[in-house]
């Protein structure tokens, strides 16, 4: 299904740095072993400083990745914190719209904003893995659960269903060459946790990293983020959210419970929780603040909205891949999310 995969640095330029070369080389070999032809878009390997200083170059790479018909799939290198800066270079003169076509696009974290950009143009994307975080896993192989979903995506162009992983892993503290071939510390995983509401609900999924969504409404991290996101209407209208399932997951920053509540409150003020069909929430990295987040969700979200917590989606490992814009049937009792590509939500 997928033959050539184009790797883009839309947030951080870290994959161009020497200190991650052992990871990048490993990831490239893994993609080749899967029968893929990986190519790096022209600016993707230019390093942290160049990528930070040149949002227009990042935008050029994304435009090229969509316009180049030899590229079947676009894979984000890694997240970061300022991909919102691509907005004017993609939308001011309809630059992206002129070349846009349905292609597999995969990324997570700060890439949440890129997913929303593509959603504006009607593109269905896939949330949940990136090149450096997943393909370049330092163990002898990709994490088996993560590999299962990546393999299904490249072989079929779809994800048919998501079930819980049997295990979860602690985040590594050492990413140096010394860590090559070493396993992560693993723990038994307890599956999807229905916090409230109906165990079965359905709709198209959209959302992503809570901190990234919060930055659309709060400019304490970047002074111009709210202005740019507002100018280009990045956050979908409430009419767009109606009947959807919101996906939320937290980053490696592991926000403390008060910040988690503040971000939930900001989302609540948009009115989104009045129109969605349900909420899916990823496992926090290292299960930090697991119960605090659970309590906050129950406090803030209206009791009629189903909440399923502890998905293997987001910054905790291993990672499933979630199709956005595809009709999803969630069944917390049966512990499965099924996707129906023939049904319009």
Go through each PLM region and give its residues.
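ATP/nucleoside-binding phosphotransfer catalytic cores, i.e., glycine-rich phosphate-binding loops
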Residues: 259, 265-268, 274, 278-345
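Short, acidic/small-residue loops that bind anionic groups at enzyme active sites
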Residues: 92-120, 124-133, 306-307
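Charged helix-capping and loop-helix junction motifs
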Residues: 21-24, 55-59, 92, 260-266, ...
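Long, hydrophobic/aromatic-enriched structural stretches that serve as scaffold segments
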Residues: 67-91
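Conserved anion/nucleotide-ligand pocket segment
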Residues: 124-211
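ATP/NTP phosphate-donor binding region
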Residues: 1-70
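Structural motif
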Residues: 73-75, 106, 245-249, 280
């Amino acid at each position: 299904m997928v033959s050539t995969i184009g790797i883009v640095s839309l947030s951080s330029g870290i994959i161009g740095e020497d200190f991650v070369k052992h990871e990048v080389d490993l990831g490239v070999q893994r993609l080749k072993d899967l029968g893929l032809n990986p190519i790096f878009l022209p600016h993707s390997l230019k390093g942290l400083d160049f990528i930070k200083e040149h949002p227009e170059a990042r935008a050029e790479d994304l435009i090229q990745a969509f316009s180049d018909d030899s590229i079947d799939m676009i894979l984000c290198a890694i997240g970061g914190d300022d991909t919102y800066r691509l907005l004017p270079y993609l939308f001011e003169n309809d630059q992206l719209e002129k070349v846009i076509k349905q292609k597999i696009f995969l990324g997570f974290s700060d890439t949440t904003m890129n997913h929303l950009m593509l959603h504006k143009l009607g593109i269905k994307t896939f949330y949940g893995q990136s090149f450096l975080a997943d393909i370049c896993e330092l163990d002898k192989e990709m994490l088996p659960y993560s590999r299962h979903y990546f393999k299904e995506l490249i072989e079929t162009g779809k994800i048919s269903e998501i079930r819980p992983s049997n295990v979860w892993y602690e985040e590594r503290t050492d990413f140096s060459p010394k860590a090559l071939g070493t396993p992560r510390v693993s723990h038994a995983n307890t599956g999807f946790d229905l916090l409230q509401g109906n165990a079965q609900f359905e709709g198209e999924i959209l959302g992503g990293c809570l901190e990234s969504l919060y930055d659309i409404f709060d400019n304490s991290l970047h002074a111009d983020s709210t202005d740019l996101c507002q100018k280009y209407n990045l956050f979908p209208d409430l009419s767009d959210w109606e009947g959807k399932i919101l996906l939320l997951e937290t980053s490696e920053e592991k926000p403390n419970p008060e910040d988690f509540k503040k971000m939930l409150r900001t989302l609540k003020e948009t009115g989104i929780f009045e129109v969605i069909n349900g909420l899916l929430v990823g496992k926090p990295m290292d299960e930090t603040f697991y119960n605090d987040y659970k309590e906050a969700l129950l406090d803030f979200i209206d009791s009629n909205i189903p909440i399923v917590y502890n998905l293997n989606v987001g910054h905790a490992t291993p990672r499933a891949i979630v199709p956005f814009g595809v009709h999803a049937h969630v069944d917390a009792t049966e512990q499965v999310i099924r996707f129906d590509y023939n049904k319009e939500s």
